[in-house]
Amino acid sequence: MFNYEELFQTYKTPFYLYDFDKIKQAFLNYKEAFKGRKSLICYALKANSNLSILSLLANLGSGADCVSIGEIQRALKAGIKPYKIVFSGVGKSAFEIEQALKLNILFLNVESFMELKTIETIAQSLGIKARISIRINPNIDAKTHPYISTGLKENKFGVEEKEALEMFLWAKKSAFLEPVSVHFHIGSQLLDLDPITEASQKVAKIAKSLIALGIDLRFFDVGGGIGVSYENEETIKLYDYAQGILNSLQGLDLTIICEPGRSIVAESGELITQVLYEKKAQNKRFVIVDAGMNDFLRPSLYHAKHAIRVITPCGGREISPCDVVGPVCESSDTFLKDANLPELEPGDKLAIEKVGAYGSSMASQYNSRPKLLELALEDHKIRVIRKREALEDLWRLEIEGLEGV
């Protein structure tokens, strides 16, 4: 059992705490699921891009799914090889494209004809041939939160099959483009196997037709991964997920690329916070803690529910419903409504669970609140993997603007 009290003697709340053994096992589970087939697991940095987490995954052989030049540079800094990096995203700038091509990453996932032509122009100016993949929008409902559904025709992502074919043929004729992969990503937090299997089958058929047209595909890039059980939902078994993809690729000699993020890191993380006050208003009980929505946005943005565990021993205290809220000046700064928790006192410690994904990576300095300390638990030892920002860090990049005023 982990001794939190020793931790609290050294580190002040709030802070993130990650169990690196859980991250390692989650990644190895993906490798095992695709064992026996040429595959590359490209961790999606958007879930959590802490350098120490990336370094851990790099040492396990991970690639990287990146959506900005900043993420690409983070991946490289952590030791992920350029030939294991794919660059996705609907709005890559010309600067980002040029930098990615100069770094000789594995390929760029292209999301529009205009982007394809931009890549061609930049590749020509560099005198190189750009490896590209085209993201196909299969128009399949992922049955997930609408904010993270990405595979329907009304979503901004990817292109329809007809346009994809035109883009592949254009790229095939170009002296500066090399089409090497097909790509699709229907959404995040998938809890139903059928949509991902259907999408895989549909895009696999497209891949076969492209190969028949003489396009030398080498990769089959499946965006995303399986969902996480935040509220005791039934989740997809990783073996079934992998088999659904593998079965769709019968007759195709392509390397599978899988891009999990949430399912690698979510369950590893806790946000440790302490009670500041309790109050009642209109018979409503509020527990006010020192972490805020700027530190962990998912409950406010997606109405996501994360279990909250009381760390401080509270035996014998009366249990009743309460809203656990933060100090930010927004009514949406609420971590959990109607949580059944014991009567709490200032200084009592709580853990908000399964926050390893889309926690620190979505954090901000809203209300001029410094970003949090991040700790890793590895081999029964604690180490700092991100220092807490100082107050001075809030305005460090603005000081020059005061000169001469």
Curated annotation (Swiss-Prot):
Binding site for pyridoxal 5'-phosphate: 225, 259-262, 358
Pathway linked to the protein: Amino-acid biosynthesis; L-lysine biosynthesis via DAP pathway; L-lysine from DL-2,6-diaminopimelate: step 1/1
Any Pfam family: Orn_DAP_Arg_deC
Record carries keyword Lyase: yes
Residues where N6-(pyridoxal phosphate)lysine is found: 46
Top EC class, one word: lyase
Record's catalysed reaction(s): meso-2,6-diaminopimelate + H(+) = L-lysine + CO2
CDD domains: PLPDE_III_DapDC (cd06828)
Statement: the UniProt record of this protein carries the keyword Magnesium: no
PROSITE patterns: ODR_DC_2_1 (PS00878), ODR_DC_2_2 (PS00879)
Cofactors demanded by this protein: pyridoxal 5'-phosphate
Biological process terms in GO annotation: lysine biosynthetic process via diaminopimelate
Disulfide bonding pattern of the chain: none
Residues that hold substrate according to the record: 262, 298, 302, 330, 358
Enzyme Commission identifier(s): 4.1.1.20
Active site (catalytic residues): 329 (proton donor)
UniProt keyword terms in alphabetical order: Amino-acid biosynthesis, Decarboxylase, Lyase, Lysine biosynthesis, Pyridoxal phosphate
InterPro entries found in the cross-reference section: Ala_racemase/Decarboxylase_C (IPR009006), DAP_deCOOHase_LysA (IPR002986), De-COase2_C (IPR022643), De-COase2_N (IPR022644), De-COase2_pyr-phos_BS (IPR022653), Orn/DAP/Arg_de-COase (IPR000183), PLP-binding_barrel (IPR029066)
GO molecular function: diaminopimelate decarboxylase activity; pyridoxal phosphate binding
Family: Belongs to the Orn/Lys/Arg decarboxylase class-II family. LysA subfamily.
Known role: Specifically catalyzes the decarboxylation of meso-diaminopimelate (meso-DAP) to L-lysine.
Subunit and partners: Homodimer.
PANTHER family: DIAMINOPIMELATE DECARBOXYLASE (PTHR43727), GROUP IV DECARBOXYLASE (PTHR43727:SF2)
This protein's name: Diaminopimelate decarboxylase
